[in-house]
Amino acid sequence: MNDIWNPWHGCKKYSEGCENCYMYYLDSQRDKDGSDIYKVKTNFNLPLKKSRNGEYKIPSGSVLRVCMTSDFFLTEADEWRKEVWEMIKLRPDITFWLQTKRAERVLDNLPSWWGDGLENVIMVFTTENQKRADERLQILLDLPFKHKGIMCAPMISEITLDQYLSTGKFEIVLVDGENYEGNRPLYFDWVKKIYDECVKYNIKFDFCGTGNVFIKDGKTYNIPKAYQRVMALKSELQNPLIYKEKDIKIQPRCKTCKRRFSCNGCKWCRKCNWK
């Protein structure tokens, strides 16, 4: 099962990739301000919640993507994060996917018991251009995490990751374009370059989505949100390439699910034929 855990909500725009933040846009549709940061009390202890039968609501083997509407190392969340670390420690049977742009804050905000890291945590640094990649990934190389990844999203200019991938310290790279109210283009050639680098070093690569504006072979495509993932999958820029569209029978709603590449069932249908 793949799910999202947002122990807090809201964020402060931090770098170029934040200009057209999807969370700010979605909040604005509800007449809310995305810069308002607050603890999500009803969901704060999600990993520890149990059903009436005493079993965890998040079953063993699940992947929890943490703070998808914020940043895990946000300054305003320092006190809440201490509790989150303890919950992560108490659930070694599920994987916690952490993301941040705030590379310089990570080391000083690890718990005292951290040591060389936990087996059930993957630390993913988000980068949007070469400048931010060089700033952040050099830091991540030296941080005490057993599992590390890179997410180029929204990718707003060409990036090369060869010098970082060659270290053997990264397990996965993801690329996505800009969506919702953002229209900065994503070029096929940019995606292909990173894909080739991942293939070179046998690193998992996931082209998550094209974004609203996708350019290939000199042609500009304006792609609706519902089809951005589908078009990315059809490019076959996935490593490993574990499927071809025509070979898989899937639930209709799965065609637009951004987590389809790593899906092992979801809380909505639990009938995924992906496997």
Which sequence ranges carry the predicted segments?
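Conserved Radical SAM active-site core
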Residues: N2-V121, Q130-D134, I159-F170, C266-W274
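Conserved beta-strand edge residues that scaffold enzyme active sites
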Residues: R102-A103, P154-M155, N212
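Histidine/lysine/aspartate-rich catalytic loop segments that bind and position anionic ligands
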Residues: F125-A133, Q138-I172, G177
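Auxiliary Fe-S-binding modules of radical SAM enzymes
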Residues: D3-H9, D162-K275
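Generic structural signal for well-ordered alpha-helices
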Residues: V84-I88, L137, V191-Y195
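Structural beta-sheet core signal
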Residues: L98, M123-F125, I150, F207
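Conserved, mostly hydrophobic/aromatic
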Residues: C18, V66, L98, L140, ...
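Anion (oxyanion) recognition and catalysis
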Residues: K89-P92, P144, K192, V199-K200
